[in-house]
Amino acid sequence: MIGLNCLEPNQTQPVHAHAGADKFYFVLSGAGRFSVGDEEKTVEAGSVVIAPAGIAHGVTNTGAERLSLLIGIAPGIK
């Protein structure tokens, strides 16, 4: 599955996990902070974040503009 996620300033995608499915995020625009497992990562346009299957992950838009993320999940969620 491929999709586009957009978060407004200060909006958060709560921490969650996908059993049996890896997920990637490619930052198209904006800035944010990801948590993947026990790690935290600040991102900007061009950054890539990978959340392996079963690992909790979430993101917060820490910038002043919309955070746009191209996402991919494989295999897709059923």
Which stretches of residues belong to each language-model region?
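A short glycine-rich, His/Asp/Glu-containing loop-to-beta-strand
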Residues: 1-15, 72, 77
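Short, conserved beta-strand element in jelly-roll/cupin
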Residues: 6-8, 19-34, 72
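Histidine-centered catalytic micro-motifs
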Residues: 14-20, 55
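Ligand-binding loop in jelly-roll beta-barrel domains
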Residues: 33, 53-78
